[in-house]
Amino acid sequence: MSTHYSFRSERTTSPPAPVHVRPIRVMLLCSAFNGLTQRAWVELREAGHEVQVQVAWDAGAVRAAVTAMAPDLVICPFLRERVPAEVWTAWPTVILHPGPPGDRGPSSLDWALMNGETAWGVTAVQAVEEMDAGPIWGSRTFPVRGLPRKSDLYNGAVTEAAIELIHEAVAKAADPAFVAEPLDYARPEVTGRLRPAVRRADRSFDWSDPSRHILQRIRAADGSPGVSTELGGMPVAVFYAHEGRDRGERPDRPGMVVGRRHGAVQVATGDGSIWVGHLRNLSDPLVPGLKLPATSVLGRLVDDVPEASRGLGPREIEYHRDGAIGVLTLDFYNGAMSTQQCRRLETALRYATEQDTRVLLLRGGPTFSNGIHLGVIEAAADPASEAWANIVAIDDVCRQIIACPEQLVVSSVGGNAGAGGVMLALGADHVVIREGVVLNPHYQTMGLYGSEYWTYVLPRRVGQVVARAMVTACQPVGTSQALRTGLADQIVPGARATFEAAVVRYARQLADRPDYPNQLADKRSRRAADERLRPLQDYRQAELDRMRTDIFGNANNFTAARRAFINKRPHRPAAVSA
């Protein structure tokens, strides 16, 4: 079987390309079809360009794909491998480097966060023999506030800057008069420098260090590779850290696990404590890439650790009331929701729907939701049974949203969403999406038919034909397409805080409408009519019948797809009929 993966799309015609940029052929060369690459693919197609994606798992496949397409421009949004010389010497090739002009090396964001940089950038660099040393096609800078997680910075400010530069590079490639600027460290705007790869020793900390220093180290490595340390004598990599309480007069020894709550553990530091949400067991060669809730990894080592009181620890689920609006925030690590997390969310939803509010606003975190937790499933003693329990639990969550009788429900999708996470959002009465968000409303790449009432909520919004096309094509959907097809009711531009404030205003306008009682009555009437036509339980049962075959019979290679995803290995998905 071939070890490369690519797909090709002919350019779209709506909306047309801007008049000042002629449509061109663009090859996106990447290490993985990650969020940034997906957004580039979506936006370039929307702009009228012909776009092909090639994942760089095999240099020979890269050379063959580029030669076959003969692109006007090769863009590398996310690339760890070297571009083959046969490519960059024959076709203009631009690499998006996550650092300011002059910055070079494979660990730019790690160094920026560990060094406490308050401003950073992205540079579009032409590929040459020496890595990151080519002529500059453009650059952007942005502020770095607080102690962000590396993955959040990458998926936020870095992605926004990179997308601007991709559009700029395409415009310049279409301009025969354009000449890139040679890298010149004498120029004042060239502020970066060559930095080596971050070593394990560079990331190290001692638990007796101040909490802020430890948080900075962990967050600079969040996503990948994490920071190696020990907890309870177990060698682990730590992820998803949050500030805890001051130690005060407590005699806790730094490095001691002093609390636990909802999968996270509280660890004493030199001047307080931090909460660690996820760990990777470095002593287990069977699960080298498996990040799991911290208490799952530590197991019996934390059996005697006291459960922290409510309000302490990472707040994955929060509810607050703003007048006639109830706001329920779900913020799960990487958007993955385990069985236990789904059960807690179901409880929170039940509480929220019982309040005397007019509108229930569902708000996500940096990632809105990606559905079930593949890591927890993989680590289970019986992965199939855990997958089934997870699916049943998330179905119960989705039913709470769809069948909510006393409020209008608004989904506030400020971050990317995939699979069941998209369907969860679509269960609401109104869906508002931040401009630039990418949705993946499909399951087949994971070898699953899908559940979460997708056969009801997706066709309800886009129609049967478009719904079938979305779940079988398995392609990302951008905000323009989401609005055109009916996946979204409104698209809001701007930074995350601007977006969230706008959605609250949207919800308030719904609550304050003079005809609100009629709106709620219409919602109940439509739901009752749909129920008479086909009960929700019927949709659910039909989906679960298909999922049972996928999960327990592994009919479409769910096991292989899941393991490939967790370990970041290539996988060619099976075809799943919709």
Regions found by a protein language model. Give the residues of each.
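An anion-binding loop in the catalytic cleft
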Residues: 2-32, 42, 202-316
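C-terminal long alpha-helix characteristic of the crotonase
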Residues: 169, 449, 488-555
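Conserved CoA-thioester-binding segment of acyl-CoA-metabolizing enzymes
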Residues: 289-363
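A short beta-strand-loop structural module common to alpha/beta enzyme folds
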Residues: 48-61
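Crotonase-fold acyl-CoA enzyme core
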Residues: 403-406, 412-419, 427-438, 442-517
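Glycine- (often His-adjacent) and acidic-residue-rich active-site loop
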Residues: 364-393
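Donor/substrate-binding cores of folate-linked one-carbon enzymes
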Residues: 79-192
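Hydrophobic/aromatic residues within transmembrane alpha-helices
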Residues: 362, 373, 424-425, 482, ...
